[in-house]
């Protein structure tokens, strides 16, 4: 029977449409028993192909296509692994090819267990190679020209499932080669997956011996994977078990903890670790963290369930004492659930490459590698790549891809988005392009590198998996799942920028304050830091900077570190429903139900609420006598909602509880509660470790805010300036002679850096810093290199006021810039004594200057216009930070944004405003009645007094606005003869409600009155209405 050997898969990136799952399905439909893959140079899909075939009852045949230079001729070879030995040889051959090291001598040394096929298209009778081979023939091969001494074998290339796919493959070739469709060669036909029986009949008729050769070749092919664990030996000269014991004992003694219950807990953990064969693993992790600390890097407090291990704490792998904080080792590792321990190594993100080099040098480049991932055609990428080849312009592509949401597939966005569907159906070529995009969506586009994963092995990695060359170290061709399935150790090196922040803050405190802070020794009950959490002042704090977490902190107001840990766990779906119960029970406003005295100590710290997975395990241990290992199995069954396992466990739980004298009814009720909570209970060890890291960051924010904001703005984002301004920092005005490159904070002043100026070349910024001081605008321009004498580079410097020291009128410099550039380039060198003749012009207003600064660097650098208004204001107002719920207040603000909606009941318009008072933001609601009055006066960017009632919603204060008044000095002045027409004037003014104050001056008795209850919207219509009753109107 025919066997399909030469199948290119999607792992021959953009040269095939054969994905493995559909390949298995179609092969069975077409009557195949044996199928193969033969990707060019790589084995990316080999493991999943072999396993997938075995699962689907198909015989896998693994092949590899390579081209090799021999005797000045490129020879195309198809290599077939005939057995497990041949499979291992292919791993090595592919690795050599993907590393640029494959040559004929190497190939010949690795041909044991491999059959070689040379396709007839690449064969000639002059070809002489130092090994035996088959000639691969397809339906179109002229058999009369074949070498009668060589064995023939059927070989048909497959790249797609059906002829209809040819157009899609043509598109992929165009994308791959970055060509238009017209420039891309057409795809060869007859490369579809054909019916097995038809091909068998064809070869039986035309070349029966070739078919027999094929049957003989594949008849005994079978591959076996070695899945045994292959941990590297940490030290071949010493027992890992003994070394781990020595190190952990020394670690506890150094911490002053060589006493009970630490000694017995340590022995218990060491026995389990040794019995499970993981001694070397812990030593390797210890070694890696030791390397980081030797370099002075802050390695954090650990993460995940590993924080429950005393061995990890003794080795300084984690920074949390699991005995003191009641963390469970069995949540991390136990003999009743055999799995690799999973200790993720957190490290400062800026040093990750140094760790990779250390692993490579310490354990060997043949024993360690990074792990491959595959970037696929996402919906946006597929649309962009395909539609571009149909000649769709960029602006249309952008408009179309904007309609695709983060979680959308092309099918779902087409179904739910009317506008997207309308665009697709608007043109025939769009419909065609969309069909192609859907066909390639999800297919691999290129390789990438796993963000964290590293694989390590005791022996050479290519004995187990194929590799390819990389920058810092080799990269696996197998993905993380296939790597671990082959028994290899995968470790995650997670570059955590929060560790970088903490380390840089520690360094800056030492430099600026001469104070050495031991980060690991920071008191987790520090009152000032706890107060910061209680206020929800946690912007920039790991795990706590999103609005949901901030609002939760404001509600809970943590009074001790344990409650910060609880907040982490409550800030999750399901658990958050118990926040009110948690607070009321803590304050004694709600009864705490501890169910049974025997489990009361487990539930008391969380006021009777099961927040943590470990609590479920402890209850199973104490109440039903489960071992902690068995309790962890129960926890897993509950969290995964494994109904069959849970039913079995429930009966076991009830029986065990009854055996200990518990009431059956109580036991069943308790199990149901455990089952409910386990579905969303959080890993306490992980919550504790990450809350500790958050607390360390918050410690710097509480005690050294200038250092905190300096690091956050320079290593993370200048967006943190908003938070800094709310904390009473001020943006300082800088000059061309003083502006730093990065942001700098000194004495509560923020000096924005040149790096914030959008579009400013870094080299130009460095040039400015190196060349200063400058003596004038002319001096700066004269010395500026010609390549930077462009308005696109110079105008932002002028608009943010860097030349105000020389010429405060920014508009004047801008209007004269063309003339200045001519002067410095043409006249300045000829007439060095001459000076530039400036043309005067009116400067920008303070508001315009501030807006320009915001546009260019993201924040105003000069005095905020609102501050000037506040200083001159005669009206009483309340800062947003001092607002109190359920009170009436007036605020002086600037409107950031206006969102208008229609009510569901009446269909009337109302508005939601986002406003600020330079330090804090506030949400404001105008209901239909108020919005109808003031809508013509409201404008984004303008300044107003808002009067209204302060409400609390979702634990945030907001205002329901009743009155709006423009915060400007202009007033509407009316000059009238006397009081004769007061009633008429009052009636007219009342018909034009607005935000402008009105002042009436009576000429006859020299009396001036400022109206307190009437404000107007000044229009031409108002002036016309007043004309018969007033002598004059002035708006100023």
Swiss-Prot record:
**Which UniProt keywords are listed?**
Cytoplasm, DNA replication, DNA-directed DNA polymerase, Nucleotidyltransferase, Transferase
Q: Which domain of life is it from?
A: Bacteria
Name of the gene: dnaE
Which InterPro entries does UniProt cross-reference here? DNA_pol3_alpha_NTPase_dom, DNA_pol3_alpha_thumb_dom, DNA_pol3_finger, DnaE2/DnaE/PolC, DNAPol_HHH, NA-bd_OB-fold, NA-bd_OB_tRNA, PHP_dom
| EC class | transferase
Q: Which family does it belong to?
A: Belongs to the DNA polymerase type-C family. DnaE subfamily.
Q: Which Pfam families match?
A: DNA_pol3_alpha, DNA_pol3_finger, HHH_6, PHP, tRNA_anti-codon
Family matches, as PANTHER family = DNA POLYMERASE III SUBUNIT ALPHA
Which organism was this protein described from? Streptococcus pyogenes serotype M18 (strain MGAS8232)
* Catalytically driven reaction(s): DNA(n) + a 2'-deoxyribonucleoside 5'-triphosphate = DNA(n+1) + diphosphate
Which coarse location class describes where this protein primarily resides? cytoplasm
State the NCBIfam families in the record.
polc, PRK07279.1
Its recorded name reads DNA polymerase III subunit alpha
Localization, UniProt: Cytoplasm
What does the protein in this record do? Answer: DNA polymerase III is a complex, multichain enzyme responsible for most of the replicative synthesis in bacteria. This DNA polymerase also exhibits 3' to 5' exonuclease activity. The alpha chain is the DNA polymerase.
Q: What is its EC number?
A: 2.7.7.7
């Amino acid at each position: 029977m025919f066997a399909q050997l030469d199948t290119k898969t999607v792992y021959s990136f953009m040269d095939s449409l054969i994905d493995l799952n559909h390949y298995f399905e179609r092969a069975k439909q077409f009557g195949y028993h044996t199928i193969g893959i033969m990707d060019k140079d790589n084995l990316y899909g080999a493991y999943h192909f072999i396993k997938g075939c075995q699962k689907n009852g198909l015989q896998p045949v693994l092949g590899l296509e390579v081209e090799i230079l021999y005797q000045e001729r490129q020879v195309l070879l198809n290599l077939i692994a005939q057995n497990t030995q041949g499979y291992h040889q292919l791993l090595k051959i592919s690795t050599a090819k993907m590393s640029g090291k494959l040559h004929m001598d190497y190939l010949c040394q690795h041909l044991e267990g491999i059959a070689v096929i040379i396709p007839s298209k690449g064969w000639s009778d002059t070809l002489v190679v130092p090994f035996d081979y088959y000639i691969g023939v397809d339906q179109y091969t002229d058999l009369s020209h074949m070498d009668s001494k060589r064995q023939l074998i059927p070989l048909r290339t497959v790249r797609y499932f059906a002829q209809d796919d040819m157009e899609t493959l043509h598109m992929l070739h165009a994308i791959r080669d970055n060509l238009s469709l017209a420039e891309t060669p057409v795809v060869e036909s007859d490369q579809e997956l054909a019916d097995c029986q038809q091909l068998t009949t064809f070869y039986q008729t035309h070349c029966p011996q070739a078919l027999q050769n094929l049957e003989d070749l594949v008849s005994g092919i079978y591959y076996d994977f070695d899945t045994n664990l292959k941990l590297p030996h940490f030290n071949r000269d010493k027992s890992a078990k003994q070394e781990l014991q020595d190190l952990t004992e020394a670690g506890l003694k150094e911490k002053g903890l060589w006493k009970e219950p630490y000694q017995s807990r340590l022995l218990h953990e060491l026995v389990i670790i040794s019995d499970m064969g993981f001694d070397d693993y812990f030593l390797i992790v210890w070694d890696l963290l030791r390397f980081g600390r030797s370099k002075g890097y802050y390695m954090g407090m650990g993460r995940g369930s590993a924080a429950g291990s005393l061995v990890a704490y003794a080795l300084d792998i984690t920074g949390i004492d699991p005995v003191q904080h009641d963390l469970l080792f069995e949540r991390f590792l136990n003999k009743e659930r055999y799995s690799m321990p999973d200790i993720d190594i957190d490290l400062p993100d800026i040093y990750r490459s140094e760790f990779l080099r250390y692993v490579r040098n310490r354990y060997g480049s043949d024993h360690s590698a990074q792990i491959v991932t595959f970037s696929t055609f996402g919906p946006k990428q597929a649309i962009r790549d395909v539609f571009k080849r149909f000649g769709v312009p960029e602006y249309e592509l952008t408009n179309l891809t904007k309609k695709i949401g983060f979680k959308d597939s092309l099918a779902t966005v087409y179904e739910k988005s009317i506008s997207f569907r309308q665009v697709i159906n608007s043109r025939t070529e769009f419909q065609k392009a969309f069909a192609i995009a859907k066909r390639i969506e999800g297919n691999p586009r290129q390789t990438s590198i796993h963000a964290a994963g590293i694989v390590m092995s005791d022996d050479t990695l290519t004995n187990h998996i194929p590799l390819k060359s990389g920058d810092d170290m080799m990269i696996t061709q197998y993905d993380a799942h296939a790597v671990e399935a082959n028994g290899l150790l995968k470790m995650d090196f997670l570059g955590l920028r929060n560790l970088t922040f903490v380390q840089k803050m520690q360094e800056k405190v030492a430099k600026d304050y001469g104070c050495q802070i031991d980060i690991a020794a920071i008191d987790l009950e520090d009152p000032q830091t706890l107060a910061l959490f209680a206020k929800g002042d946690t912007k920039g704090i790991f795990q706590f900077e999103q609005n949901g977490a901030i609002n939760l902190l404001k509600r809970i107001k943590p009074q001790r570190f344990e409650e910060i840990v609880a907040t982490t766990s409550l800030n999750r779906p399901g658990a958050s429903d118990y926040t009110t119960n948690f607070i009321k029970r803590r304050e004694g406003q709600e009864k705490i139900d501890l169910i049974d005295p025997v489990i009361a100590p487990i539930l008391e710290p969380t006021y009777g609420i099961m927040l943590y997975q470990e609590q479920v395990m402890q209850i199973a241990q104490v109440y039903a006598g489960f071992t902690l290992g068995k309790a962890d199995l129960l926890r897993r069954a509950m969290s995964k909602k494994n109904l069959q396992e849970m039913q079995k466990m429930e009966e076991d739980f009830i029986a065990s509880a009854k055996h200990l004298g518990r009431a059956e009814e109580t036991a069943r009720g308790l199990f149901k509660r455990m089952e409910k909570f386990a579905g969303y209970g959080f890993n306490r060890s992980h919550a504790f470790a990450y809350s500790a890291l958050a607390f360390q960051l918050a410690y710097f924010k509480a005690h050294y805010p200038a250092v905190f904001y300096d690091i956050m703005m320079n290593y993370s984002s200048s967006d943190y300036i908003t938070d800094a301004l709310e904390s009473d920092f001020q943006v300082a005005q800088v000059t061309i002679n003083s502006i730093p490159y990065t942001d700098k904070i000194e004495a509560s002043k923020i000096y924005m850096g040149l790096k914030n100026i959008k579009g400013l070349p870094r080299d130009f910024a460095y040039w400015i810093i190196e060349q200063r001081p400058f003596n004038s605008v002319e001096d700066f321009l004269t010395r500026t290199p010609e390549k930077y004498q462009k308005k696109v580079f110079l105008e932002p410097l002028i608009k943010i006021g860097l030349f105000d020291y020389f010429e405060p009128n920014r508009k004047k410099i801008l209007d004269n810039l063309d003339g200045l550039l001519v002067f410095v380039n043409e006249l300045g060198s000829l007439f060095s004594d001459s000076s530039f003749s400036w043309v005067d012009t009116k400067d920008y207003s303070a508001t315009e200057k501030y807006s320009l600064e915001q546009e260019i660097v993201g924040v105003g650098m000069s005095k905020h216009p609102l501050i000037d208004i506040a200083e001159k204001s005669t009206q009483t107002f309340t800062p947003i930070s001092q607002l109190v719920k359920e009170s009436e207040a007036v605020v002086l603000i600037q409107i950031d944004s206006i969102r208008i909606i229609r009510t569901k009941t009446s269909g009337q318009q109302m508005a939601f405003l986002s406003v600020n008072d330079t330090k804090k933001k506030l949400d404001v609601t105008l209901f239909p009645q108020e919005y109808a009055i003031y809508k013509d006066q409201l404008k984004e960017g303008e300044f107003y007094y808002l009067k209204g009632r302060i409400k609390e919603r979702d634990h945030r204060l907001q205002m329901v606005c009743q009155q709006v008044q423009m915060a400007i000095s202009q007033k509407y002045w009316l000059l009238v003869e006397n009081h004769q027409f007061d009633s008429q004037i009052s009636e007219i003014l009342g018909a034009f409600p607005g935000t402008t104050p009105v002042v009436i001056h009576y000429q006859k008795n020299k009396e001036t009155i400022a109206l307190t209850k009437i404000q107007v919207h000044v229009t031409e219509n108002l002036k016309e209405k007043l004309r018969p009753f007033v002598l004059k109107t002035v708006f100023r």
